[in-house]
Amino acid sequence: MSSEMPTQEAWRRGAEGAQAAYTRRRITIDPITRLEGHGKIDIFLDDAGDVDRAYFQVPELRGFEKFAQGRPAEDMPQITSRICGVCPTAHHMAATKALDALYQVEPPPAARRIRELVYSAFMTEDHALHFYFLGGPDFVVGPEAPAAQRNILGVIGVVGQEVGVRVIAMRRRLREIITLAGGKVIHPVLGLPGGVARRITAEEQAQIRETADEAVEFAKFTLGVFRSVVLANPAYVDLIVSDAFTHRTYCMGLVDGQNRPNFYDGQVRVVNPDGAEWATFKAADYLDYVAEHVEPWSYVKFCYLKPLGWQGFKDGIDSGIYSVAPLARLNVADSMATPLAQEAYEEMFATLGGKPVHHTLANHWARVIELLYAAERLKELADDPELSDPNVRTLPTATPREGIGVVEAPRGTLFHHYVTDARGIVEQANLIVATQNNAARIAMSVEKAAKGMISNGTVSEGILNKVEMAFRAYDPCHACATHSLPGSMPLVVAVRGSGGETLSVLRRDADGSLHHE
C-alpha cells in the first residue's frame, strides 16, 4: 500500500499540471448578457495564455425571409414587427416604406408626419432603454462591479430612486404615443401603403405636445447624467479612447438633403475611415453597395461594401467593413438638425479629437446625443399644425412588383426589400438589419478587446465583462423574444483542453454569486 501512495501522488500532481497547462486554452462566455437575443463568445488562448482568436457567435437561426414568401405584401408590416419585441417599430416602419415603393404611392404630408412622430417617440424611448438598462450600467455602476449590480437596479442605487421613477415614467409616456397612433406599442398596426391607419385629432396632438416637452427635458437630464458619471471620470474616458476599443472603418447612415441625420427618411451616406464621403445612394440602389459574407461559426451574415470586396476581418481604408449605429450616424453627418443636439454633437467631437471618431465605446455618448435629437424632433412634429390634418392616406392603384424601404433603427441602418407577383404576394424577401451591417465590426471589436484585456491566462469576471462591453456598445439585436432581467442571467465560463474536454468552470448564478467547479 505504501508503495502505491507515491505513484498516486505523482499521478495527481501530473493531472493537476496537465489541467493547469490546458486551463488557459479556451474561454467560453455563454450566454452573453444585456442584449436583445442570444449569443456567445469563444476566446482561444495560445500557450502563453494570450488571446490568439476570439469569436462573437450568434447560435440561433431566424427564418423570417423564408416564411414571408407566399404571404400578402400588405401583411409584412405586421409580420416583420414580430422579429423583435424590443424594436418592432423599426421593422414595421421599414416594411411600410417598402410597401410605399412596392405600390408606387406617396403618403400625404400628414401621414409622413405621423409616421415620423411615432418613430421619434420610439427612438427616444429605445435609446433610453439602452442607456439606463443595457449599456449604461457598465459605466454608471462600473465595469468591474458585481454582475448582479450591473442593471437598472444598480443604476438606481447610484443615481437615486427618483431617477429610476423618472426613466420608467418617461418611457411609459413615449410608448403611449406609439399606442395612440399605432394601436399598440409592441406590434403596431399604424402603417399602410400610402399612409397610416388613423389620423391624430387636435386634442390628441395637445397631449402629445405635453409629452414631447417632457421628453426634451428628460433628454437634457440624461445627457447631464452621462457628463457627470462618465465624462467626469478620467478612467472611463481613458477606457473609451483606448486602443482596445478602437477600429478605423467606413461608416454608414441616413442623412437629409443637408447631410444631417434623419431616422425616418433620406439617402444613405457612407464616409471612409478618414471622414471623406465615399458614396451617397438611394435605398433602391443598396444592392450596388452592400453585400453579405458567410462564416461557418455564426448564423449572422457579415455585411461589407460591395465595391471594395470582402478582405477578411480587418479595418482600414482598403477593407469593405463598415459600421452603422449612433456613432456611425454622427460620423457621416455634417451637423445635427436640432439646436441642442448640435451643441452636444460639437462637444463630443471636440472632446474626442475631431471627426471621425472610431472609438467603439463612444457609441454610448453618440446614443445620448441622438436621444436628445429624437426628443427635439418629436417636439417639432408635435407642434406642426399639419400633424392633425385628416388626409392621411393615398390609395394605391399601381400593380406591385418590387419595393425597398430603409429607416435608421436604433442599432443602425435597416433595409426591407420585397419582390411580389402582380397580386402582391411575396416571392422574395431580403432583410438587412442593423446587426448584420455591424456584424463584422462587432466581431473585430470583441476580438481586439479580448486581446487587450486578457494576458498570461489571467481572467476574471470583470475582465470578461469588459470584453462584453465591446459588443454591448453596438446594442446588437439578435431578433429573439426571450429576455431576462439584466444582471440576473446566469453566466458560465468553461475552460476546455485541446481535445474539447472541460477542465474548469466558472459559474455565475442568478444571485450574482460565483462558483468554481
Q: What label would you give each PLM region?
A:
Residues D52, V426-Q428:
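Short hydrophobic-aromatic micro-motifs
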Residues D421-R423, L431-A434:
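Short, loop-centered acidic/histidine patches that primarily coordinate divalent metals
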Residues G49, R423-G424:
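Glycine-centered positions within short beta-strands or beta-hairpins
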Residues R411, H416-Y418, Q428:
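A translation/RNA-centric and nucleic-acid-associated enzymatic feature enriched
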Residues S2-R411, V433-E517:
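Active-site bordering "gate/hinge" segments
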